[in-house]
């Protein structure tokens, strides 16, 4: 919390204005934002899941969880009781599949590994990124390239993916 507040304070001292818990269209209009600021960055968060598989057979089976439910319960239980309260979704000894990527998917991978999952597979719905920047992705744009994040590195080390032919970390 202290680290995040320090960064917020640094950005604010550089002239960044933060408007939190604000619904565009209810609390402020998009036009007003565009009129009042040179640049607008919308950080909407990901706490409400998009259930892509709502109509898939078996979606309601026990053991299927949304990422933020898994991560939030884990963090709260860890901070409150070092997991002694049992109020978290335990991946220990389980065969885990993480569907989705980005920071949230990587955090789910890392958390599952730290719990001691039996196995772990991760899927993303986007094609694999190239190893090098494409001509239509020049600097200073964010590089859309293949990365191996900390969770993938931990999974590769634990399960020795380097020895499994055809396995690919993404």
Where are the language model's segments positioned?
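Residues forming the flavin
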Residues: 1-170
């Amino acid at each position: 919390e202290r680290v995040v507040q320090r960064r917020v304070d640094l950005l604010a001292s550089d002239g960044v204005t933060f408007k939190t818990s604000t619904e565009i269209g209810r609390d402020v209009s998009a036009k007003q934002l565009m009129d009042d600021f040179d640049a607008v960055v919308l950080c909407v968060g990901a706490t409400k899941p998009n259930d892509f598989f709502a109509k898939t057979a078996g979606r309601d089976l026990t053991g299927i969880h949304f990422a933020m439910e898994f991560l939030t319960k884990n963090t709260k239980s860890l901070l409150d009781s070092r997991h002694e309260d049992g109020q978290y979704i335990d991946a220990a000894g389980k065969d885990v599949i993480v569907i989705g990527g980005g920071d949230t998917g990587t955090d789910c991978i890392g958390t599952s590994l730290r719990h001691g999952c039996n196995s772990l597979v991760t899927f993303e719905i986007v094609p694999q990124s190239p190893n090098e920047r494409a001509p239509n992705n020049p600097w200073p744009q964010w590089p859309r390239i293949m990365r191996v994040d900390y969770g993938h590195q931990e999974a590769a080390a634990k399960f020795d993916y380097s020895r499994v032919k055809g396995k690919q970390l993404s």
